[in-house]
């Protein structure tokens, strides 16, 4: 118990290397005891903090009386990645979330892992890397992450001039968004994309929606008036 207490003190002082040595001594020296299982549990927390879940699994498997279930390993792997994300350790979080997605393709936290990984890539201005992970979120059942994923997917697709794909996502965003600004963003870009595709009736329809919205900023209204005028010229309908 004294050795276990020593390890806990070292852990609380962030002396993780010393704590792991103490916990290992307890786990190896006093197998199958309550103290040994507490040492294993505390070691698990340290390995998660360090983002070294694989090392934890190898260590536990070396103990004849203990084992790590797939469910526990999955949970620990996700927790390790999420901790690095919350601590703003971008590179380490990216590595660990990628590891989780590869190791647990049917994992319970797969949606969160894809979304957080997308956010990390997006903030690092790696939009091409972020895109497939946002698209994964968009393809799943509606969640708290869907609207953000739709918004950023459309943004990335528009920037890369993938207008056909962007149109599909913008239509969803216009329908599903709860944030009025996101709906306005969707309608503004639907106006522009439809004009680009020579669907002038649709372009005018979205322009008129924008103009009827009292929250629309003046520069967006200016775009709408221009689209209506150009679309009217294209359709020989100067009365618009």
Where are these regions (language model features)?
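Acidic, polar-rich low-complexity tracts and alpha-helical solenoid repeat scaffolds
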Residues: 1-240
């Amino acid at each position: 118990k004294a050795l276990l207490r020593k390890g806990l003190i070292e852990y609380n002082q962030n002396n993780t290397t010393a704590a792991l040595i103490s916990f290992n001594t307890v786990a190896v020296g006093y197998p199958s005891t309550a103290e040994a299982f507490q040492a294993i549990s505390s070691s698990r927390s340290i390995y998660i903090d360090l983002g070294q879940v694989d090392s934890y699994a190898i260590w536990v498997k070396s103990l004849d009386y203990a084992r790590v279930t797939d469910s526990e390993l999955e949970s620990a792997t996700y927790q390790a990645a999420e901790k690095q994300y919350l601590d703003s350790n971008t590179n380490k979080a990216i590595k660990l979330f990628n590891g989780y997605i590869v190791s647990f393709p049917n994992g319970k936290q797969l949606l969160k892992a894809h979304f957080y990984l997308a956010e990390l890539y997006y903030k690092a201005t790696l939009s091409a890397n972020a895109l497939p992970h946002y698209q994964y979120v968009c393809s799943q059942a509606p969640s708290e992450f869907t609207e953000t994923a739709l918004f950023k997917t459309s943004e990335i697709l528009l920037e890369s001039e993938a207008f056909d794909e962007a149109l599909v996502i913008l239509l969803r965003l216009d329908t599903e968004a709860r944030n009025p600004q996101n709906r306005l963003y969707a309608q503004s870009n639907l106006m522009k994309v439809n004009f680009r595709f020579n669907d002038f009736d649709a372009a005018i329809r979205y322009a008129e929606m924008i103009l009827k919205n009292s929250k629309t900023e003046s520069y967006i209204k200016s775009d709408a008036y221009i689209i209506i005028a150009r679309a009217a010229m294209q359709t020989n309908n100067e009365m618009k």
